[in-house]
Structure formats: structure tokens, C-alpha cells
């Protein structure tokens, strides 16, 4: 904050006032806080004790790395956590003061609660007395009721996320997995008009700077300098916007004067692996002078906008450079003559000058149709950027191209392959760029055939808006050509979610078969029930840990080439089989899998890469548990993009056509799992640079995952009867075709294993009842010291939850009748019959609770810290979980 004087009306956001001093409200900077010590560490961030420099007030600062959130596909959850805390004003919910961010991190500035978390206190106590447990549960119940009334579901309720205030009261925190029904960004009115208590205290009022920080947008396109090494998802996330393709801009007026082609590219575009950044010297990067002679003629604009777009330069820098500051080689007479001659050129395309213009525009102009060599929409500049320049053209060759003589161009064009070695070397003038001094760079040959050949090898900028094989593999196409009509945003990398303990949904399918007595109302909610397996094999889903993004090396491409032809012989039979399977039940789709981790090596493109296939650099992304749930999704999408040919081996065909196992037939009402495959796919199967095929040896072992059907519609469709014309049609997502009931709105499994509600494990739609289930688990844990469904492995925990296997204490440790009854109504399998706040208030266990004055009641435990910076009460949980929080790395 600062005091400014408004002198003119042109100072941006400062209006004209009569020489009066006033303070402009603005959020603070993270530099205004100094770190005292680390407090704790969670699955997605670290919490530090920090002090405000101007008033020495203590805060708890949660630091979340943007790159980690991008890699774990948790960007939306960070936004939800900030929104949930900003909307909440309750004495039982931790108060959020500021939401700040830097280039790499997001900082949530919250109140510091010195009493630690309830999990640490529980480790010290062993278990709580009934009176103590009832008070804690009562305060948490009020907090949950407040959240639910405001459209917020916590979804990660556990003792670790309950903090103890200085007076001993409970406050909920860690809304990282919460669900907020607000379908838009926060506005100022959302925060200012948030209802709290009947008589709100001043503690819940927010300053203008706090409000501005809480409604600010969180940006996740980190700058190039802030990238962490070894993370590929950060690079691809920066390319999801406009980094890979220049911004398409239409002319609003037909007037030529006063309109320029603006090409935008964020700074994150520097992460593109195909961009010739290394070819640019610091001098060229500093000047960034466009080759522009006049804006009155569209043909005379031979600019560096495309090159700047490839190099990740922001358009806001374009006006910072002047011709006078350019180095000598950019102001040389040869460059100016080249530009002016190209601008004055009105000759036919056969002339040498026009050839120079044509070739130069191949490198620079984003408005050249490379299929015809003609410019589209040049008369009134109303055309779109239908094609973008090749990313494989180096900056050296581009600059050198401007220095070519017309005679050299003609001679270079007429030379054959045998005579190319006799090319005349370009005379280097004193004004030439410094990289031409050694003469080691040979001139780039602008041969149309070579350009087209390159387009078949790699998906470059030139191919973003059209089918990759339109010019290369036209003879192999049997169906309609396609043209991308709009930019399709990338699908998330993963459909499973990064959790407090990340949960793989693949091995949950075995557990669902054992819940017939408790889940009779789920006839169409589950996608697939696999054959039952033994307890030893319950965790076999964990074998699907092979990251699909790691299969983009040359060996896998060669393997894909070898396997791409293995299913061609029984093509028609497999088509008929797929069509028949679309009418079959889920039993006909039952396939077991034991070695899918080894077999998935043949998949060399992931779902993420199918969204923007010009990103070959994702081969090094580390394996994450979130990608386990994507195994069948990638295989399914590979089937979808395989046109007019069979990819399923004969063994898989036999399995699909054979009668189902007895266990699968026991569920005739299950919704069938059907795989989508389009026979008029725009991707040609033989093009190895495009999404490749699954190994023919591994397709008979595909494991159909339950959690892989949420985002991509699946259906078996017959081959097209008619061959469409040659008109280009846009890519379109297949229409959603479902059998049975609607799928759950969000099938991501959220939470910590011990506290997950059954409907989450069953893949059903869920609501606030999941929090009341978790509250019942917490009540049992408070009274016994151990969660009711705790076991050695997550799969066994899920088995206990679905079977509702509660180990009640016996003999002298037996719980009271009222306590056991309260736990029973909170842990009801049927979420419609699960208890809520109204039921708890009427229950005998809570008869002594004064609900309206609960925040003023004395609490059984009051923290006694040594000083205001004492974090001892957090250490018990950290030690129990073997967490070391001595590091200060952000």
C-alpha cells in the first residue's frame, strides 16, 4: 500500500481528484511476510509460520507449488480451496485473510491456531473421553452444517484437518479436496455478503486489500524462468493456451489502413521443444525488430511476428524496440532491399522475385496456403490464420534467406540432387549477422516436397488446424478428410485424483462384487464388475503404474510400426464383432489382466498428447499414481483413432464373443462397458508419428477400469455406409450414448482411505452425506483411538468400508449404548438415511450440548504453548507420520 497523488486522469486506475492524497487499496505482496519456521506438510503443500513485517502479527501460510498442481491435475482443487475458505465466515472454520501468488507458488494466508491439530492431540491422549469427543464432534457438526448450507462439501474430513484454537475450540481447515457449487469465479459481492452468525464480530470483516486478493484469478502458466527441471507437464500446460498456435484474429473492419496482424504467444511458449530458440543470438532477442515497411499494404508486411511467436516473445515487447536500436546486420542495405523488393513485387509467381517472396513467406507469413502457394484473403485482410509456419525452419536460414540474390535463388531452384554440392556459397558482408561468420551453416532449401515430407514426420505448427495426413498419406485414406475448425482444449491428463493418499480406482472393481447386501440400489451406477480375485490379487491394480507418457521414444515407435499391421487380416470380422458387442451385456466385455504394466509399453501416445499432438517432449514425465487409472483410457482412445482396420487380436475376439464368467453373469443389471471406435477416424493408422497402436500381443490382457469412463463418451458405432465428399469437416466429439442410469457427475475418488464413504467407492454421485460419514468415522476414532475400518492396505480398508465391518470394542472397553448408536446412524450405508445435524441434536449422546452457545463453552483441552511461535502441538502427528518439516524450501 502506498500514498499517491492524482495529478492527471491518465495514470491508469487513478482518477482525477483535486490534489488530494488517498490510499489505493491493493493486496500485499508475499515479500511483506517473513518465514519464522515450518509447521507441517501435507500431500499438496507445506504450511509455514510467518510474521507480517509491518505489524509482527503471526499467520499460517500454506504454500502450494503451481507446477505440482498442474502435474497432479489439481488446479481446480486449489481454486476450490481458496473459494471455500473465502466464502466461509464461521467460528468453527479457519479464517482466510489473503490469497497471494508468485510466478511459481500460491500462498494462502490464514490465521495461526497454536493448539495444533486434533490428530496430534489424539496421538498424545491415545483416545478421548466421551465428553471430550462429544464436544469436538458437536463443533465439527456445526461447521459441516454451515458449509453445506453454503454449498460447500469438505470431502476430506479427518482429525488431521481439525485445528485447535487458543481457547481449545475446533476449526476446520484444508479444503483442498472440497467441492464448491459456485460455478463461476468469486466476485466482490460473494465475499462481502457472505452470511455468518446472527451478530457477526469484527473478526470476520475483511479489508479492501483482503477482498481484492481473494477474488484475484490464480494463474498457472508459470514463466519460463520458474520452471522446475524434469517436469514435462509444466511445459505442456503452458502450451495449452495459445503457445502452440498463433492467435486467430479476424479483421473487424474491411479497411486496410490501421489494421495489423497481431500474433500472440505467451512467454510459456519458450517451453516448446520444436522452437528454434538456440538459433537466436542475444542481439536478435534484444532487438526483435520486425521486417516491416508499411502497414498500408498487406503484402508488404514481411514481419517477424511468426518467428517471434515461435520464440515465445510477447507482443507487449514489440513496441519497445526501435529501428535505430537494431544491430547493423538488420539495418543493412541487403535486408532493406530484400524487404522493399518483396513489398514492391507484383510479378507472377514464376518470376524470381515472386519466388523469393513465396519462399520467404513460407518461413514468415502465417497467411500462406502451402498447398497452393497462394495467399488467401490478402485483398481485404479478412482471412483467418488457416496455416501456421513450420517450426522446423531455423532462424539462421530465415535471416540468410533474406540475403539471397535472385540469381542464386533461381540457380538453387534448378539444381538437382547431384548438383547441390556445387551451390555457390553466400558471400558474407560486414553487415551480416554474427552467426554467419563461420560459414558452417548451409542454406536451407525451401522445397515444397521436403516441406510436405516433414509434415508427415512430425506434427508442426503447419498442421495444427488440419488433418496430419491430408497431403502425405492421401492415397492411404479411404474416408473423409477432416479439418480442425477450432482449437480443442486438452483433456486432463488423468481421471483419478491426487489425494491426501492417492487412490487408484482400478482395484475397487473387485470390492464392488462383495457389496450386494448393502448396495441394492446401484443397478446402473457401476460401469463394470470384474471377475473376483483373491485377497492377494486385490492390489494388482497397482501394477498399472507405468506412465503412458514415458513411451514416446524411438524404440516404442519402431515397435508400434511392427505391430501396426498385425491385425489387418481379420479386419471385417473384427468390425462385425465390435458391432455385435455393442448390443451385448457387461458380461461379454469381461476381460482379466495380470501383466498390463509390461504390455502397455506399446502405447506411445497418451490421452494428453492426443489433445495437442505437437508435444513430443512429454516422454520424460515421472510416473504418478494418477496415471494408473488412465491405462484403459489410452487403449480405448487408440482403438477409437484406428480407421478401417482391426486392432483387437483373435484371442481378445474369442474372449469377447465367449459366454461370460459366472461371477459376471450374477449382475445382469449392470451397465455394460462398451468401447468406442470410429471407422471414419481422421487419424490414419499407418502414420507412426500420430497416436500409435496397442501391442497386438497385449490386447488380450486389457483390464477394463471402472474409473475411466467419466470424461470420454463411449459407444460402439458401425462403419459409415457412405463415403463423404472431400469437403473438410471439423473434429467433433462423439455424442454421449449411455445405457442404464446416468453416470455420476464426478467419478473422481476423493479423500483419505479410512474416511471415504461407500458411495465414493461405488462410483455413485455424492453429496454432503460423505462428510457425515467421515464424522462418524472420526467419532469412533475419538472414542477408541483407531479408525473403524483401518487395515494394513488400502484395498482391505475399502473392503471393510463396503462390508461395513466395524470392530466394536468389547468387555471393559465397550462403548456406551448412546455412543454406539450415534456411530451407527452416522455410518449408514444408505446415504439418504444417514444422520445429519438435526438428527445429532435430537440424539441422546448430545443431550447436554448447548448448540446455540457452543463457541463460548469451556473446552476440555486448552493449549499452553511456551511462546507465540511454539509449534510443539503439531509435532506429534508429524512424528507419527514420519514427516520432517525442518526444511525451508518453497
Curated annotation (Swiss-Prot):
Matches recorded under Pfam families: Pkinase
CC terms in the record's Gene Ontology section: centrosome; cleavage furrow; cytoplasm; nucleus
Biased composition (Polar residues): 576-592
Modified positions (Phosphothreonine) in chain numbering: 752
Active-site residues, as the UniProt record annotates them: 156
GO terms, biological process: cell division; DNA damage response; G2/M transition of mitotic cell cycle; mitotic cell cycle
Major localization class: cytoplasm
Classification via Gene3D superfamilies: Phosphorylase Kinase, domain 1 (3.30.200.20), Transferase(Phosphotransferase) domain 1 (1.10.510.10)
Composition skew (Basic and acidic residues), residue ranges: 412-425
Name of the protein: Serine/threonine-protein kinase greatwall
Protein's organism: Xenopus tropicalis
Gene name of the encoded protein: mastl
